[in-house]
Amino acid sequence: MSARLATVLSRFASRAKDESYLIDEGIGAGYLLHVVVERVAMKVRGLALFPSRPARPSVGARARIRSKGDLVVGRGVTIGSDAYVDALSVDGVRLGDHTTVGRGTRIECTGSLRQRGRGLTVGRRVGLGTDSFYGCAGGVTIGDDTIIGNFVSFHSENHVADRLDVPIRDQGVTHAGIRVGAGCWIGAKATVLDGAQIGDGCIVAAGAVVTAGTYPPNGIYGGVPARLLKTRAASPEVAE
């Protein structure tokens, strides 16, 4: 029973994801049925929140979305349970096809009503891990096929602290923005600060703090602050 159900669901999942997706036949039927019920409920929530949209996200239980008009999603987008998305911003929040926002993750684009933030643009097939924070006031862009671990934080805003006679909170903020290229892997509990420009194919080690600067493609970066540890290279058979 479970193997047959896994085969059937694999076909549906492959069609929905536009790629081969094979479910482990050892997973019990009860577990698979629970997943199916949960996914159907997420689809229904998305339909209720965005009844007139051609593409609607699947929305988990207790997820909250503010400024829905500023949220644009592609096909097959999932917003996990307990996630919080406040899309109020100049460019809005744009989530590409088959992108996932993990459980408990917060996306906030505007820190003050005095000035709208820039927003968040995410490519296709991107995984934003669970329990993470994306502060997008200065703009955050993430390329296709990037995976971002759990408990990661992005902060695209800096406080001005040049004067000693004025409280820091009254000196204003600066925004340089953050860019993460395509095909990157950002490890769990990493912190990415305003002004960081991470090239395609990079790996950021767990717990690293990525400060403002340019990080060339295919580098492996780690530490506090993050520095180049090594450069990824094609294996001999691929290079040939």
Task: Enumerate the language-model features and the residues they cover.
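Short secondary-structure boundary/capping segments
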Residues: 49, 75, 170, 177, ...
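C-terminal/domain-terminus segments
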Residues: 197-222
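Terminal amphipathic alpha-helical/low-complexity segments used for targeting or macromolecular assembly
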Residues: 1-56, 145, 151-152, 156-164, ...
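Conserved beta-strand positions that form and line the central face of beta-propeller blades
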Residues: 62, 84, 209, 220, ...
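Short coil-to-beta microelement around the adenine-binding A-loop and adjacent beta1/P-loop entry
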Residues: 70, 177-178, 196
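Flexible, glycine/small-residue-enriched loop-and-beta-strand segment within the central core
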Residues: 64, 79-192, 224-225, 232-233
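Well-ordered beta-strand segments characteristic of repetitive beta-sheet solenoids
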Residues: 57-58, 76-77, 221
